[in-house]
Amino acid sequence: MLRDEVAVSARTLQWKCVESRADSKRLYYGRFILSPLMKGQADTIGIAMRRALLGEIEGTCITRAKSEKIPHEYSTIVGIEESVHEILMNLKEIVLRSNLYGTRDASICVKGPGYVTAQDIISPPSVEIVDTTQHIASLTEPVDFCIGLQIESNRGYRMKTPNNAQKGSYPIDAVFMPVRNANHSIHSYGNGNENQEILFLEIWTNGSLTPKEALYEASRNLIDLFIPFLHAEEQDQNLKDNQKNGVTLPFFTFHDGFDKLKKNKKEIELKCIFIDQSELPSRTYNCLKRANIHTLLDLLNKSQEDLMKIEHFRIEDVKQILDIIQKHFVVIDLPKNKFLIGNPSE
């Protein structure tokens, strides 16, 4: 009943992009409206959306530089105009776009004289440099400029700490937020009805994604936060039915399937198959992500018992995951009835 009411009330609401522009490679702007809203709803949505845009969207950046030849962060190197600290600040500003999870290694190796720019970064295929002209260093003499880099995807902002420093390795303040700023304003609907409002939402991004993409990601993250409330009654009923029928969920691990996968002729690189390639429903996808399950390898290393410990995860989700893996990768041959919920005697 609740979902029906939500669907009916949402039919009259309309999103519209009223302005979109790219001021530079690293500055995109978009303005959107949502209307008509009842009085008070615009502020509720605007505040929640701004928080989600600034804090809930993942971004990618350089989080560490490595070189055994650098004595300390505030040193200078012969033949390089900038100090090490200035180079680290320039690396902090590099804007990256990627679909990676966790950390990856990259590097720069250039011989002077000349300029070192973002174009000189040797990165994994899953990482794209948004603006290859971003300046890193100026080499005034024929010196070798070779450093290792660590690239990471995450959310929010992370300050470097003294405890995070290692010899020859220099942490960088990480700004993972792809949304630079977000504002909302509320206006009268203009039909003489003071109880109806229009929400205007302005979004500025760093170029790693468009304002429209940011709006989609923020909306999806907010929806995922509220989905458990919509399913609460349904989950309670499933639990009562299972207890009533005396059903014991079968213990199953993905290791059998993993063994077959390793023997597959195609030798699929499990680490390169991300769960977002498998067309999982957004709720299941986000449950797995929050449990640090990002690739097919991560998934196949989990047992059903492990998966059922994930918050908001259900036995139906396990069955659905298996069905999708069988459909797309055709490597696991297990009887589907092991996952059916109900009275075994039926």
Curated annotation (Swiss-Prot):
Pfam families hit by this protein: RNA_pol_A_bac, RNA_pol_A_CTD, RNA_pol_L
Example GO biological process: DNA-templated transcription
Organism: Ranunculus macranthus (Large buttercup)
Region (Alpha C-terminal domain (alpha-CTD)): 268-346
Domain remarks in the Swiss-Prot or TrEMBL record: The N-terminal domain is essential for RNAP assembly and basal transcription, whereas the C-terminal domain is involved in interaction with transcriptional regulators and with upstream promoter elements.
Complex formation: In plastids the minimal PEP RNA polymerase catalytic core is composed of four subunits: alpha, beta, beta', and beta''. When a (nuclear-encoded) sigma factor is associated with the core the holoenzyme is formed, which can initiate transcription.
The UniProt record lists the keyword Transcription: yes
Family listed: Belongs to the RNA polymerase alpha chain family.
Primary localization class, coarse: plastid
Subcellular location as annotated: Plastid, Chloroplast
Annotated region described as Alpha N-terminal domain (alpha-NTD), given as residue ranges: 1-233
NCBIfam families membership: rpoA
Record-given protein name: DNA-directed RNA polymerase subunit alpha
KW Plastid (keyword) present: yes
Gene Ontology MF terms: DNA binding; DNA-directed RNA polymerase activity; protein dimerization activity
Function: DNA-dependent RNA polymerase catalyzes the transcription of DNA into RNA using the four ribonucleoside triphosphates as substrates.
The reaction(s) this protein catalyses: RNA(n) + a ribonucleoside 5'-triphosphate = RNA(n+1) + diphosphate
Chain segments annotated as coiled-coil in the UniProt record: none
